[in-house]
Amino acid sequence: MSAVPSVQTFGKKKSATAVAHVKAGKGLIKVNGSPITLVEPEILRFKVYEPLLLVGLDKFSNIDIRVRVTGGGHVSQVYAIRQAIAKGLVAYHQKYVDEQSKNELKKAFTSYDRTLLIADSRRPEPKKFGGKGARSRFQKSYR
């Protein structure tokens, strides 16, 4: 039994985490078990398509991508999915294709949007005393 060439990558945005399994196949792309064409919300569907459209659908004809996403809200999940797909494609090409095609993919992704490969490190600031949030203060009264 020969092992199917596969890689596993993840994408994160805020508290949403998407794990992508990229393996040799026939071009299927699924998110939480359903096709990528059914990603909700519909307005953000093209954000998920971005890695596919940037490099061309011919690169996806011989691989399958399965993405599992948990946590966060709708928008965070969409950004985590697109990052996981982009990182998975780069990792697959590095491991099983060649270095030149990997570098072409990385260059295409980073020139379009850096967050396709590098996670957004911003996190919520912790609340402090003297106010209801991190920066806002309670109203001051003089009399």
UniProtKB/Swiss-Prot annotation:
It is found in: Cytoplasm. The keyword Ribonucleoprotein applies. SUPFAM superfamilies: Ribosomal protein S5 domain 2-like. The keyword Flavoprotein does not apply. It comes from Saccharomyces cerevisiae (strain ATCC 204508 / S288c) (Baker's yeast). One of its GO terms (biological process) is maturation of SSU-rRNA from tricistronic rRNA transcript (SSU-rRNA, 5.8S rRNA, LSU-rRNA). The modification N-acetylserine is found at residue 2. Gene3D superfamilies: 3.30.230.10. GO terms for molecular function: RNA binding; structural constituent of ribosome. Component of the small ribosomal subunit (SSU). Mature yeast ribosomes consist of a small (40S) and a large (60S) subunit. The 40S small subunit contains 1 molecule of ribosomal RNA (18S rRNA) and 33 different proteins (encoded by 57 genes). The large 60S subunit contains 3 rRNA molecules (25S, 5.8S and 5S rRNA) and 46 different proteins (encoded by 81 genes). The modification Phosphoserine is found at residues 34, 61, 76. This is Small ribosomal subunit protein uS9A. Its main location: cytoplasm.
